[in-house]
């Protein structure tokens, strides 16, 4: 892959090939190297949670590493990313919803387009979901002791609903969603304590 990429670079496609090379290199350094310490513990917890729902060990391994990569890249708690993913798709890469949400993080096509990711690409979906979650944390994370909860509600209902109701909207789906994410997060957090 790297040789092919560098050959293309010499044929005039240097910038695109160089960006791809850097991406592959960075991913290999941050995700594929053996994990140590706290990262290994987080990996084990996320892998265990993913494997409870998704019995494919290769996918679960990849998902756990991708969550840690997205977490480090966008400064979002990896347990929160995993809790949202568990609630959204139960770690199923091909998940879809009647409303049109796609993939592991259940991105809506318009949201994915506005972020600039392909929602059908599992890594793009995780990165897009993490960016969207980071945006909601930036918007609502400072709303007192319930800031993270409000950000999670915004991930589900959209930020407009949060502004309209000055907090978590009265939608049953959103209120249930917040409870499910909180429950998943606390389960993951407790797994880290052992």
What are these regions (language model features)?
Residues 21-32:
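Bacterial N-terminal signal peptides
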Residues 32-38:
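Membrane-interface motif at the C-terminal end of an N-terminal transmembrane signal
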Residues 6-23:
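Bacterial N-terminal signal peptides that target proteins for export
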Residues 38-194:
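Catalytic glycan-binding domains that act on GlcNAc-containing polysaccharides
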């Amino acid at each position: 892959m790297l040789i092919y990429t560098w050959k293309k670079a010499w044929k005039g496609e240097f910038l695109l090939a160089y960006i791809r090379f850097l991406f592959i290199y960075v991913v290999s350094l941050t995700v594929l190297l053996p994990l140590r310490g706290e990262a290994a513990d987080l990996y084990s917890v996320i892998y265990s949670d993913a494997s409870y729902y998704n019995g494919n060990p290769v996918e679960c391994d990849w998902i756990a590493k991708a969550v840690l990569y997205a977490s480090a890249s966008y400064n979002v708690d990896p347990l929160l990313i995993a809790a949202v993913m568990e609630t959204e798709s139960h770690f199923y890469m091909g998940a879809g919803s009647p409303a049109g949400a796609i993939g592991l993080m259940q991105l809506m096509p318009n949201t994915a387009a506005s972020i600039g990711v392909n929602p059908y690409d599992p890594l793009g979906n995780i990165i897009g979901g993490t960016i969207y979650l980071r945006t909601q944390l930036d918007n609502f994370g400072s709303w007192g002791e319930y800031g993270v909860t409000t950000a999670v509600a915004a991930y589900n209902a959209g930020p407009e609903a949060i502004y309209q109701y000055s907090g978590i909207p009265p939608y049953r789906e959103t209120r249930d969603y917040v409870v499910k994410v909180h429950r998943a997060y606390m389960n993951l957090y407790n797994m880290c304590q052992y």
